[in-house]
Amino acid sequence: MWRPLRTTSSVGHLHLLPGEPYKPLTSQWLHPSTGEGGERSSRTLTMAERVSIALDVAEALDYLHNHGQVPIIHCDLKPSNVLLDHDMVARVGDFGLSRFVQGANSNSFQPIANTTGIKGTIGYIPPEYGMGGGVSVEGDVYSYGTLLLEMFTAKRPTDPLFQGGQSIRSYVAAAYPERVTAVADLSLLQHEERNLDEESLEESLVSVFRVALRCTEESPRARMLTRDAIRELAGVRDAYG
């Protein structure tokens, strides 16, 4: 069974900080051409910063799913619920839709009956939720993969580009792995061409998009485990020295 997470005071982890006044990972960072108030922002997240943020969020999810007294499903992971401090350390916040999973083994696929309607935000909700499937840790993983796709393409999953059956996932999958730079955030490419050789940047993007695509598989059982996502992204981070 599951029940609402009414307090997060007992959820202690470096990358879990609900309710704190930190800046969200929203348009100011991911879509600098449309910053707050409509002004154009010159601040672009570097490749290293994006990978570090992605790792922080993966570690937070892994803690929620696997290292508490009971698994916790966030149910609404999206950029505005990822909070950044002054050092660009990411913390996952807003547990308003989160659920404690009681009597579940987080190491197996055990969806929890969804009796109160779809949980989450359009664009980040896994397909099984829309078909009446129960909430699960795999659902959070799907939302995480979508977050990764947005972070490295600067495209929202609800972008008008994605019509007629196309999605942000199919957009990236069509370019993976040979043409990943064609779908990557242009501002990221322009910034990193001064810091990384083209081959190194492309290899890093391939690794990140591999994680994102594995996390957003249609079948929940096929999705990557958070610990595997952490391992692969840590390899990308370590490549920067």
Predicted features along the sequence, with ranges:
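Catalytic core of carbohydrate-active enzymes
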Residues: 56
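Protein kinase catalytic-loop region centered on the HRD/HxD motif
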Residues: 59-72
